[in-house]
Amino acid sequence: MAKKLGKSPVAKEEDKEGLFASCSFTDLGLHPTLCAHLQDKMGFQAPTRIQAQAIPVAMSGQHMLVKAATGTGKTLAYLAPIVHLLQMREPRVERTDGTFALVLVPTRELCLQVYGIAQQLVHRFHWLVPGYIMGGENRAKEKARLRKGISILIATPGRLLDHLQHTSSFVYPNMRWIVFDEADSILELGFGKALEDILEHLGSRNDTSNQNKNKMEPMKRQNLLLSATLNEKVNRLAKISLKNPVMIGLDEQNSSAHGKNHTSLLSDDEEEILEKHNVTVEQAVDDFKLPAQLVQRYVKVSCGSRLAILLTILKSLFERQLSHKVVVFLSTCDSVDFHHTVLSQLEWSPGLQLDTDKKQKFISCKVFRLHGNMDQDDRKKSFLGFSSEKSAILVSTDVAARGLDFPKVKCIIQYDSPGEASEYVHRVGRTARIGEKGEALLFLQPIETDYLRDLELHGASLTEYPLQKVLDSFPVNGQRLHKRKQISLDMHPWIMSLQRALESFVTSEDTTKKLARDAFCSWVRAYTAHRGELKKIFMVKKLHLGHVARSFGLKEQPSLLGRSHQVQLKKRKKEQKRERPAKRRKIPAKR
């Protein structure tokens, strides 16, 4: 039978309806200096409910599995107790002792973010040294930092495994903590085998065949696994990395209904652990928990008007509130590059009078981009730049959808559909974080509205965005018309004028036109890649490719074949023509 944890005084004081617990960080047992720093310098007045449950468990030394909604403070839930325990260690931790805590994250941007939080946490404990290693960075410089010693190491799996295999100066015999942050994302990115190899190297795999190889005492190593969603891959990772773990947030609805504490300790029987995890996975897949303060909307637009309406909504947002941060999610890297160019460079005349010389930027704020094909330096600049701005737009692929906590993001626009409902949850999780208000907007074509039913099945309910009202608020040719007949969005004067401006901008330069063509081709390829039941909703056969081209500011539909393919196709047709037997001319008979 699974052993139950008694309900702590802290848990009794929790505000069950809200995000925050009614206790303080001091009540959780953290060092007074660390608590004062959290409140005075980092601005954390009270722990979230997840932090109130996880921090005491993390300090107890037990393995832990945490399932919590995005934006609930999972990073602090493991970093704060690690810093607390390290600063108390006697004799004092030195750099030559090597690495004590390892945090594994899925992306480079999340690596930088966790490193930044760790830096702030150890500010008053100067002998603790955080550091990071990740793909794209200079390996020799990382090797030098590892040689000097890093107390708290944040890493992406691929680069960590590389150093474990090839960097002899990497000192980790004292490693006490291994943290899997955003574990579901790590596994979805294909790092499952790398994680198993890492656990083998560090002697933390729960295989009986490896017990004799493990030189460390089993009780000295504590593994923590944190995830916003659960699936079979996460289940397997938990089975091989966690031993008798404390479970947090996995069965809140069930436990509350029975009046039981939802934090429980499992038995040593791995089959029982697996069975318990499977039950939890089935429950978790059916429903996703989203912040109550998140306003979710959808906008239904025809394909050809998508770009003009995106620009209109962004302009409306920034005119409504000057200090605004927005993340726009797109499906491909090429699409990100194209839309970044349009948003940052498109100029227009007041009232969209194209014949006037007085022009200004359509979007006045800074625009950043983020995707996996960018150079590491450019990715870092974009991530840090957008984080530091008070008013900005970030256009990004799903590389920014997991774990990243951009300050003060008020709106998420899913311009391209996320596909799986779990991805929708991760995207909208970039706003309405830690109790703050936020809004999320999903673009859908008329042929895609069945996707709303799929989201409803997973607990996400969206209302329609008042697009007509927003369009009518903009003047055309310097005049604001007060009475307008109900017309289709495609024929709206504002949309028609803006579409002409977009097509003029895109076709004015060859470089911009090439960006648009590449974005068009990659978008169509991505649209065909939807899996399972979603293929019935997102059917490429139902698309009008001419209208898709229009959504990239193109007047004509580009060929979906590359230039080399076109040349080969023409060559093949010529060869086939030559190989055909020549037709005999019919000579009319003489009469």
Swiss-Prot record:
Up-regulation conditions: Induced by auxin (NAA), abscisic acid (ABA) and jasmonate (JA).
Keyword Transmembrane helix: no
Family: Belongs to the DEAD box helicase family. DDX31/DBP7 subfamily.
Domain free text: The Q motif is unique to and characteristic of the DEAD box family of RNA helicases and controls ATP binding and hydrolysis.
Domain Helicase ATP-binding as annotated: residue spans: 55-248
Organism: Oryza sativa subsp. japonica
Renumbered residue ranges of the record's region Disordered: 562-591
Lineage: Eukaryota, Viridiplantae, Streptophyta, Embryophyta, Tracheophyta
Main location: nucleus
A GO-annotated cellular component: nucleus
Entry protein name: DEAD-box ATP-dependent RNA helicase 17
